[in-house]
Regions:
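Solvent-exposed alpha-helical segments within well-ordered globular domains of core cellular machineries
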Residues: 22, 41, 45, 75-82, ...
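Conserved C-terminal guanine-recognition region of P-loop GTPase G domains, centered on the G4
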Residues: 46-54, 71-135, 187, 204-208
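Conserved, well-folded catalytic cores of nucleic-acid-processing
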Residues: 27, 46, 50, 80-87, ...
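Conserved glycine(s) of the Walker
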Residues: 16, 143, 234
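P-loop NTP-binding site
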Residues: 172-280
Length: 280
């Protein structure tokens, strides 16, 4: 009987959840940045091996909310934990041992799903982590086979939920918006990427190339000027970087048109969050 189930990738911000998801599925799906809190919405990646299908969900980092967007991120992370068949609880190997997930997530009760502690970034640790966890390095691939084998034991017997050739469940337009944000994290400095959101206004696959028109939202006029840059240089560079990422994912040429608008205090405004796809 085949096995199939959801695996939550949970933990504090910047512990390597997105990098691990990408390494497990063999595709760049989730935003990766040295800056914390880059993941705002769960990203689902699929791995099918022989008679087992893993539905990995990269969740926002567990944090103490400072404003309404953080509240939605925390709520999304807790839903991922609550819905999972098995939880991969990530913690940096260099900071072992890991505190209990129930404390980090401030849960009222332990999760119903079994928890496997995963010590990430093992290539950066000076010493092996303590027993009771699995050390992995998404960079070198060390420990990934052991992690997959351990997770497989907890998947329920079930037919596959998705075609074995599929790698993701979300539409391309979702990843297009995410890759625009990833480019912003790469090219913009300090706090500006946290004030930026992206909305896909038009997505057209035919005729070629794939045409995408998107709006980049910031909170202040001064931020708009920075994102556009002198003579439009910054927004052009951002668009080029994002277009390359999208084209690589879908293996098709892409024309990406970006506009920049101000949406004041959108991170603290429930209707704006809903409009931008962040459930309140």
């Amino acid at each position: 009987m085949p096995r199939c189930g959801t695996v939550a990738l949970a933990g504090r911000p910047n512990v390597g959840k997105s990098t691990l998801l990408n390494a497990l599925v063999g595709e760049h799906l989730a935003i990766v940045s040295p800056k914390p809190q880059s993941t705002r919405l769960p990203v689902v990646g699929l791995l099918t091996q022989d008679d087992a299908q893993f539905i990995f969900t990269d969740s926002p980092g567990l944090l103490e909310p400072e404003y309404q967007l953080h509240e939605t991120m925390r709520a999304a992370a807790l839903r991922v934990i609550d819905d999972a068949e098995v939880i991969a609880y990530l913690h940096p190997a260099a900071e072992a041992p890991a505190p209990p997930l129930v404390d980090v997530a401030k849960l009222g009760r332990p999760p119903r799903a079994p928890i496997i502690t995963v010590y990430t970034k093992a290539d950066l640790a000076a010493a092996p982590p303590p027993p009771g966890g699995i050390a992995v390095s998404a960079l070198t691939g060390a420990g990934l086979k052991a992690l997959i084998a351990a997770l497989r034991l907890h998947l329920p017997e079930s037919p596959f939920h998705y075609d074995p050739d599929e790698l993701a469940t979300q539409p391309t337009r979702f990843f297009a918006a995410e890759f625009v944000r990833e480019a912003a994290f790469e090219l913009l400095h300090e706090e500006l990427p946290y004030s930026l959101a992206c909305e896909i206004d038009e997505f057209r696959e035919h005729p070629a190339p794939v045409y995408i028109r998107a709006t980049v939202y910031v909170e202040r006029d001064s931020q708009k000027g920075i994102v556009i840059g002198q003579g439009g240089r910054t927004i052009k560079a951002l668009g080029t970087a994002a277009r390359t990422k999208i084209a690589t994912l879908i293996a098709q040429p892409v024309y990406l048109e970006l506009h920049v608008k101000v949406l004041p205090k959108w991170r603290r405004h429930a209707p704006s969050l809903k409009r931008l796809g962040y459930a309140v």
